[in-house]
């Protein structure tokens, strides 16, 4: 009976995989929006991506459109639709070599004239200007999780009267499994929108099993399969709130070569970081791909988890509102990996130009506004600590000089390290803010005329989770090593004094709003144990200073004094000062964990730090 049940479960699982494979391979044709009373055109779906779009139009709407595609690295032209004549012509290029793809088309259709009036194209990196007019009924061609690979539609009297598209899944990138290939290979697949819950079972030998719950692209929730076997040990879970745009971006862990078993795992989302689940033993590894999220896992497992790999897909940036004038020349820098430097020139009236030094494997310079540097226009520079510092918001003002003339009058930049640039320009007029919670600026767009910057907006992408840095421990070399690990922050410390030394340390941490009580290090004595409670989360530890020395006429060095510094106050020292002093601190960082060595006293102390964010 058990064999029959197992056979049924295996057949069901195989059927699900086959169905997923068919869904992933299928091209979806979205029917046209607009009129069908004309001549049909169809570029087909036998393309990898759209690379360039030409659009022409006039007073009656869009009368010319042409698409360029790529197939197996070769460029292909679609059907020439309509006729180019007097009016406007715009070109929108898509950099498929940088993994940019077309995700949607929005437009306006006028039922009175029967013509498409305007079109706007959105990729996974940027959004085009509206080409044409926002008159009539708005429509959209888009399918969640898919990209456009072809177009079809109708035309009449040399004008475009309807448009439809062909869609294909955006295939996630497979990152090979870290660990050994012992045991049975497993693969959860890629037909998911995200990970919602992770179940980890650990034991003496390492991670026994892992299980992932997913949300499908259709919105259906899937309880994943167990990979490995359950034994005596601990089970921990980590939940991800996908309904509030939280997604998994990184997995770190440890793998033991000798046993061939994953020893520990830690999960990071765009919002929070889990505890280290398991033991810090063996080689460290990570599964991460910049500006992408994890949508599936694969690996090997038998009695324990032997290896783990992941599937990544792009997280599309969001585009803020553009503040300022709707007139002038439209510009759009798109999306970059980093912003290294911002230059702004202003006079007593307004901002003249803005210049960015972006970085995408090389420095890319973009300047918008007045192109000539004039002596009275002082250029101000704001340099970021690339790649560790990101712009998180831009405050500005815009000023009306007449009913139709609006200009940007000032700009101020804030960063992920809590720095604020000087205000560049004169802060007068209407205030505006470019910001998105939990995100960093990855590009700008806007408008300029022949003299000044008249409008500005920004692209935002989720901030990467802060990466902890382990600062070297200070003190003696005797005692047993210990490491509390990395947490969201510190809530409370207990520091106990011994005879001429610090004898005891215990730390209470915060992990995803949950209180985590650290282990005892050293021994309590008859002396008082001092308690330091922080006003968490507004208060955090910025530094620990102390002293160490040999005690009791021996060669054993121990910590003799500790003092805690926060962003709000400095504690009274515990212990006695001695000749050898130290400071555990990194500018612009906060302490989120402790490590060191201990016997019946605290012999050595070090810290884990992460960059300060807003």
UniProtKB/Swiss-Prot annotation:
Query: What's one Pfam family the UniProt record gives for this protein?
Result: Jacalin
**InterPro entries according to UniProt:** Jacalin-like_lectin_dom, Jacalin-like_lectin_dom_plant, Jacalin-like_lectin_dom_sf
Q: Does the keyword Repeat apply?
A: yes
Q: Which CDD domains is this protein grouped with?
A: Jacalin (cd09612)
Q: Keywords assigned by UniProt?
A: Lectin, Repeat
Residues of the Jacalin-type lectin domain: 27-169, 172-314, 317-462, 468-611
**GO MF entry, a single one:** carbohydrate binding
Q: Which residues cross the membrane?
A: none
Which family does this protein fall into? Answer: Belongs to the jacalin lectin family.
What name does the UniProt record give this protein? Jacalin-related lectin 14
């Amino acid at each position: 009976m058990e064999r029959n049940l197992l056979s049924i479960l295996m057949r069901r699982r195989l059927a699900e995989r086959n169905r997923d494979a068919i869904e992933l391979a299928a091209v979806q044709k979205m029917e046209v929006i607009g009129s069908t009373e004309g001549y049909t055109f169809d570029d087909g779906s036998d393309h990898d991506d759209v690379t360039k779009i030409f659009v022409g139009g006039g007073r009656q709407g869009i009368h010319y459109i042409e698409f360029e595609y790529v197939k197996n690295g070769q460029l292909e032209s679609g059907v020439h639709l309509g006729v180019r004549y007097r009016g406007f012509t715009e070109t929108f290029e898509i950099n498929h070599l940088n993994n940019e793809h077309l995700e949607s088309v929005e437009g306006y259709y006028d039922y009175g004239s029967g013509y498409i009036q305007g079109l706007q194209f959105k990729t996974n990196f940027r959004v085009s200007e509206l080409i044409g007019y926002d008159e009539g009924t708005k429509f959209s061609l888009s399918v969640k999780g898919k990209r456009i690979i072809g177009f079809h539609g109708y035309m009449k009297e040399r004008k475009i009267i309807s448009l439809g598209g062909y869609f294909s899944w955006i295939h996630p990138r497979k990152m090979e499994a870290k660990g050994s290939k012992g045991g049975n290979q497993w693969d959860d697949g890629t037909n998911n929108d995200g990970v919602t819950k992770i179940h980890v079972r650990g034991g003496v030998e390492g991670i026994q099993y892992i299980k992932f719950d997913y949300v499908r692209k259709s919105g259906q929730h899937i309880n994943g399969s167990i990979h490995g076997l359950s034994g005596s040990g601990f089970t921990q879970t980590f939940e991800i709130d996908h309904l509030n745009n939280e997604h998994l971006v990184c997995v770190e862990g440890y793998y033991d070569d000798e046993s061939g078993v994953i020893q520990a795992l830690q999960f990071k989302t765009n919002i929070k970081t889990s505890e280290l689940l398991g033991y810090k033993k063996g080689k460290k590894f990570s599964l991460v791909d910049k500006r992408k999220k994890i949508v599936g896992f694969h690996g090997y497992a038998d009695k324990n988890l032997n290896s783990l790999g992941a599937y990544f897909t792009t997280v599309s940036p969001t585009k803020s509102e553009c503040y300022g004038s709707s007139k002038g020349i439209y510009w759009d820098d798109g999306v970059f990996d980093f912003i290294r430097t911002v230059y702004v020139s202003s006079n007593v009236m307004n901002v003249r130009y803005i210049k960015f030094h972006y970085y995408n494997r090389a420095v890319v310079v973009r300047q918008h506004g007045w192109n000539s540097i004039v002596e009275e226009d002082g250029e101000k520079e704001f340099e970021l600590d690339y790649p560790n510092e990101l712009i998180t918001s831009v405050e500005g003002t815009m000023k009306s000089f007449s009913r139709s003339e609006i200009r940007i009058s000032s700009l101020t930049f804030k960063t992920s390290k809590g720095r604020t640039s000087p205000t560049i320009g004169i802060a007068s007029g209407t205030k505006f803010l470019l910001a998105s919670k939990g995100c960093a600026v990855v590009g700008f767009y806007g408008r300029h005329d022949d003299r000044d910057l008249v409008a500005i907006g920004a692209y935002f992408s989720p901030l990467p989770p802060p990466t902890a840095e382990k600062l070297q421990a200070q003190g003696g070399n005797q005692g047993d090593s210990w490491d509390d690990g990395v947490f969201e922050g510190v809530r409370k410390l207990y520091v106990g004094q011994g005879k001429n030394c610090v004898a005891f340390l215990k730390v209470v941490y915060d992990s995803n709003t949950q209180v985590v009580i650290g282990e005892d290090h050293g021994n309590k004595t008859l002396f008082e144990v001092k308690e330091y409670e922080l006003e968490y989360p507004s208060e955090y530890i910025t530094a620990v200073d102390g002293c160490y020395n040999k005690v009791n006429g021996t060669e054993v060095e121990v910590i003799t004094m500790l003092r805690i510094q926060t962003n709000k106050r400095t504690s009274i020292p515990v212990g006695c000062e001695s000749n050898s002093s130290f400071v555990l601190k990194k500018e612009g960082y906060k302490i989120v964990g402790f490590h060191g060595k201990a016997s019946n006293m605290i012999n050595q102390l070090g810290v884990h730090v992460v960059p300060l964010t807003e």
